[in-house]
Design a protein with these regions (language model features):
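Structural and coupling elements of P-loop NTPases
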Residues: 1-215
Length: 215
């Protein structure tokens, strides 16, 4: 199903009080979403890993840009067949007119999806589709041979190559450039399986701006 109106949630997490306004993503209910965006201090935009940037995504970003609202992007459905992650990053920058910086990175996609490397925390988050959750968090040196014991030699080498390219192409993440809405951190995962969501939340509570008083 789809959301047809904004839902409000409040919860405590890691010593922080988090207020979430879950807005409709479908364009038929865009007015409610745009109105809600005027009341938030930061936004998380969910992008379908197969469809990429859609018309509604562009409109949401326009509102965030007008209000100078910091944005985090969550690329969803990595456990399904989809687009190349680097192509998605290029599209995000070109279509949303904002620089991006991946803070997690998928290890394969679709049926071969094994998890993500959490760049922000330097951890390997492994995914088992039969259990539909993070089954193991591993602190492993990306250059260590131990990496291959967890994800296989081929995927280990591909991950090393991808992370090297990321470090070469994208600037090191700086919190202030995010808070000033110049850079959008990007996370990958599968919301349906609750995979990658906690990693995003762990980062969000540390970097998102505190609520500002409304006028």
């Amino acid at each position: 199903g789809i959301s047809v109106s904004t839902s409000v949630m409040e919860f405590d997490y890691e010593g922080y009080k988090v207020n979430i306004l879950d807005t409709p993503g479908h364009q038929d209910f865009a007015e409610d979403t745009f109105r809600t965006l005027t009341a938030v201090d930061s936004a998380i935009i969910v992008v379908d890993g197969a469809k990429g940037v859609e018309t509604q995504t562009r409109k949401l970003m326009e509102v965030c840009r007008m209000r100078n609202t910091p944005v985090i992007v969550f690329v969803n459905k990595m456990d399904r067949e989809g687009r190349d992650p680097f192509d998605l990053l290029d599209e995000l920058e070109e279509e949303l007119h904002i620089k991006v910086r991946p803070l997690s990175w998928p290890i394969n996609i679709g049926a071969k999806f094994k998890g993500v490397y959490n760049i922000y925390e330097n951890k390997l988050d492994l995914f088992k589709p039969d259990k539909q959750r993070v089954t193991e968090k591993v602190e492993v040196d990306i250059a260590s041979p131990d990496l291959a014991t967890h994800i296989g030699e081929q995927d280990a080498q591909q991950l090393r190559d991808d992370l090297e390219l990321i470090d070469g192409v994208y600037p090191e993440f700086d919190v202030e450039t995010y808070r000033s809405a110049e850079v959008a951190p990007v996370f990958f995962g599968s919301a349906l399986n609750n995979f990658g969501v906690q990693e995003l939340l762990n980062c969000f509570v540390k970097i998102a701006p505190s609520p500002r008083p409304t006028k």
